[in-house]
Regions:
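Aromatic-glycine-rich donor-binding/catalytic loop that engages nucleotide-sugar donors
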Residues: 58-60, 100
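C-terminal alpha-helix plus adjacent terminal tail
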Residues: 47-53, 68-133
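CoA-thioester-processing core
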Residues: 1-43, 58, 73, 77
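Well-ordered beta-strand positions
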Residues: 1, 42, 46-48, 54, ...
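Residue-identity detector for threonine
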Residues: 7, 28, 32, 54, ...
């Protein structure tokens, strides 16, 4: 979940002559998965900087807000997330990340495993609280 402003900029400058390296912490992989092969090549090979509006159009960011509101918007979004069940969010994140590298069938199997485990835990918690009441 990425929030930026129109004046935000994004760049992977490693191909520039003064650097002459590649991103060393997964930048090529993650960027390609987020914005696609063609746009990733454009950014990576050229070292081109893109602004917030382009990042939004390319799917690199989800939301564009005025520059002075980026921090407040991010905090507000985090507060909304914090009200939800952290274990649910953690397992949803696991499923989403798993889906990136696996076919639909395997993704569904993984989701069903996590779902079943969560139900077992919920039932155990409920049974435990009934016994102690």
């Amino acid at each position: 979940i990425r929030i930026a402003s129109e004046i935000s900029f994004f760049c992977l400058p490693e191909a520039k002559p003064e650097l002459g390296i590649i991103p060393g912490l997964g930048g090529t992989i993650r960027l390609t998965k987020v914005i696609g092969v063609s746009r990733a090549k454009e950014m990576l090979f050229s070292g081109k900087m893109i602004r917030g509006k382009t990042a939004l159009e390319w799917g690199l960011v989800k939301t564009l807000v005025p520059a002075k509101e980026v921090l407040n918007e991010s905090i507000e979004f985090a507060r909304k997330l914090a009200k939800n069940n952290d274990i649910s969010i953690e397992n949803m994140k696991k499923c989403i990340n798993y889906a990136v590298d696996h076919d639909t069938r395997k993704g569904i199997e993984y989701e069903v495993e996590l779902f079943a485990e969560m139900i077992r835990v919920k039932l155990a918690e409920k049974n435990s609280s009934v016994r102690t009441a």
